[in-house]
Amino acid sequence: MLTGVLQDWVWEAGETANESCPVGSLRTASAVNSCHQGRIPLFTVGVESTKQVQEAVRFARKHNLRLVIRNTGHDLAGRSSAPDSFQIHTHHLQEIQFHADMRLDGSNTSLGPAVTVGAGVMMGNLYAQAARHGYMVLGGDCPTVGVVGGFLQGGGISDFLSLNQGFGVDNVLEYEVVTADGELVVANALQNQDLFWALRGGGGGTFGVVTRATMRVFPDVPVVISEILLEAPQAISSSWTQGLSIVLTALQSLNRDNVGGQLVIAVLPKLAVQASIKFFFLDATEATVIDRRMKPFLTKLSRANVKYTYSSKNLPHFSSNYRQVPDIHSDNDYGVLGSTVAISQQLFDSPQGPEKVATALANLPVSAGDLIFTSNLGGRVISNGELAETSMHPAWRSASQLINYVHTVEPSIEGRAKARERLTNTQMPMLYALDPNLKLSYRNVGDPNEKDFQQIYWGPNYGRLSNIKKKWDTDDLFFSKLGVGSERWDSEEQLCLLHA
């Protein structure tokens, strides 16, 4: 196992030198000679037990080592790696235990069915195990992402289940955490409540090493999935924009009936574009019934002379929809940058909302290989705001959709620098301008150059998070880029304390 390798090469190299050597690039002597350490940790410990996590944390503290926590290396800001660092890799913590009736220690209150998950478990494995027990789990659509890492500490947005079940952090019942002094503590609604609140949205690798977490599970219900596929030779055209507007209007309408959906736009060679929007009708069993429900939207596409393909299928279990095989990337060097912007329910549900979003997406400057996709919020995300005590920005409880933009980066230091500059100075301002009253981004997939991260990610909750950070990690043993308390340090390359 290559313990230091990240999901993509962008965050393996340093900020100022092209030091990375993706495996596929080692074809010439000159390429090999250019290899350096970059941001890959100097040392990694592959922990196999909670006790080993405690020993590793105490070792890092004793020797004043720069400590990073790695689950699967998917973080799009490179937080699971750092220059000159000592890494704790949680991959081997593979516990999965289901509870028919979860109760916290010292309480007789039933919290319903739940699952306890070790810090190394990936989504695909958990989905498969849950299905065998008749459950589905709120998670992401990438099967190789870790459940307990950044996903379940940074928010936990599910592209198509958050509408019905809320955020991942809304459904966490308990964390087991190794703190900066190497002690093992439990954080839940009954004990260490401040730490529990901070971990539910405050970001991974910041307050301690989460070794396992317990979260709610839900019945594995049947589903009908309908899909509309659009294609166009170029994005900037009236027919393309109109087609996007119509399918987003369908999303707007169906969301009101708690039907989740996801739009995915792929930029093809020569800037041709393809869009797929899928709708998930939970507890439905008859595809023909759903086809009749979708017919008015298809009629609108036909009348607008928008070419489309429609299909539908019924699955006896929603879990069957989850991909349970690893993502397959091309043999070329794989590197991406990405960011996100939230869209309020007030904007998206307005009569002009779908058209405004469609126009913004159609006019966003993109390159071949880029992806734009939505994550469905609203619904339970909003209603949970009255119930769930989480540290996420309160404005999430007014959000309807999340726009995700992923850009394929040229495999060079120049390509990386150009992509980051374009993302920060051109694309993100255009996306933020779509809903200027809600300047909100998802910390797990945020602009790596974000200057106002405290406000963008946490807003009025940041002060409390900062105080909890100081209480549980007085010496900032756990440093996370653009994380709580990181403003006290300079660039991650040097990591020198600016102020206490």
From Swiss-Prot:
Residues of the FAD-binding PCMH-type domain: 37-220
Enzyme Commission number(s) of this protein: 1.-.-.-
InterPro entries in the cross-refs: BBE, FAD-bd_PCMH, FAD-bd_PCMH-like_sf, FAD-bd_PCMH_sub2, FAD-linked_Oxidoreductase, Oxid_FAD_bind_N
Keyword entries, A-Z: Alkaloid metabolism, FAD, Flavoprotein, Oxidoreductase
The keyword Flavoprotein is assigned to this record: yes
Any one GO molecular-function label of the UniProt entry: oxidoreductase activity
Purpose: FAD-linked oxidoreductase; part of the gene cluster that mediates the biosynthesis of fungal ergot alkaloid. DmaW catalyzes the first step of ergot alkaloid biosynthesis by condensing dimethylallyl diphosphate (DMAP) and tryptophan to form 4-dimethylallyl-L-tryptophan. The second step is catalyzed by the methyltransferase easF that methylates 4-dimethylallyl-L-tryptophan in the presence of S-adenosyl-L-methionine, resulting in the formation of 4-dimethylallyl-L-abrine.
UniProt similarity note: Belongs to the oxygen-dependent FAD-linked oxidoreductase family.
Name assigned to this protein: FAD-linked oxidoreductase easE
Taxonomic source organism: Arthroderma benhamiae (strain ATCC MYA-4681 / CBS 112371)
Source lineage: Eukaryota, Fungi, Dikarya, Ascomycota, Pezizomycotina
